[in-house]
Amino acid sequence: MPADLDAVLIHHGITTPTPIQAATLPDSLAGRDVLGRGRTGSGKTYAFLLPLVARLAGGPRAKAGKPRALILAPTRELVRQIEEALRPLAAAAGLSMQTVFGGVGQNPQVVGLRKGADVVLACPGRLEDLIAQRHADLSSIEITVLDEADHMADLGFLPAVRRLLNATPKGSQRLLFSATLDKGVNVLVKQFLEQPVIHEADSAQSPVAEMDHHVLHLSAREHRIPVLADLAAAPGRTVVFTRTKHGARGVARQLGRAGIPAVELHGDLSQNARVRNLEAFHSGRATTLVATDIAARGIHVDDVTLVVHADPPAEHKAYLHRSGRTARAGASGTVVTLMLPDQVKDVRSLTRAAGIKPTTTRLDGPTHPILSELAPGERSRPGAYVPVVSQPPRRPAGEGTGNRKSRPGSRARKRQRAAGAR
């Protein structure tokens, strides 16, 4: 590995590789195609960024609209997280990069591509649009990374991914990372990876030993929000998952009314709102994030101590991916599933398929000693999260703004000055 990349890792306190990094780096740095299987939080982002940057370092600059490397990810949040990890590595190697995703105007992205971006980090849909408009050309790609391929399949992106991979040169290096190897992902591997070396570490198919799994059997639906508020009021970061965007919005607002600084994350939010809410959660201004399943893959936040499934997910894969928000990189974490009487059968099937044996506790009301055990510490309810909105500086008293409507009494003052002059 180039010494300047080592220096970046040391600066960020990274001195020992995770299992997935130790397994894949020798092959990926040697230029081989790699299939890496590892759960979220296993360190796979650096497992593909390091060989990508090492391969491009010292090479020719990218031509306008023709990147040398492509990273595909399923969500805007994940693209931004990868961008944050890539930025210092790219700077050390003298590489430029450009993110490409929907939900924002395309003009800045087009400008970045025209300047000649070495690395493009993209969601499939917007990248296909820019290629169709001839703003991007993948014929010079040397290395392609497909991150969270199983999530791409879940979201129906595989046809677009196949078209994009077909647009990259045959024989170029390809790295594919996935928590599971489902049928759709397996088709990608067979079609686009040449004699791939397969490495598996911390598979999402197996129980996660670092997590404590609990099921709270609620006797009535009206206990759901009080129980959530009690858990979220404990010290530390909490991520709450719901099945629907409407549910995420409602839970976040009800937690806010209960004094919990909570933000929501789902597909109905504008990109600016998503960024603002994630930054509030990162900074600690909001201690609870309420998200939908789609957002589960894009949230990379350290020190999440508690994950709560306010709505049990529909399948075990979603349970494992949601739960991966805690116990990241070997840290401990607690996962709680709220279960209503009509959900007992589904939750039992879910946990059985996930390969876990949770501790189940029945709650006949909104309070129970188990809540303090699952989320220990003194409860704090400082109030709902209020987004920070920049305001213009106040003007000294008597100083005008140039807007007649904002200067009540100005005519009276003119009459007074005129009278004084007379």
Regions found by a protein language model. Name each.
Residues A291-V307, R322-G330:
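SF2 helicase motor core recognition
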Residues L25-V34, Y46-K63, R87-P88:
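Walker A/P-loop NTP-binding motif
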Residues M1-R37:
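Conserved pre-motif I regulatory segment
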Residues L5-A7, I14, A62-A132, S140-I143, ...:
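Conserved nucleic-acid-binding Ia/Ib motif block in the N-terminal RecA-like helicase ATPase lobe
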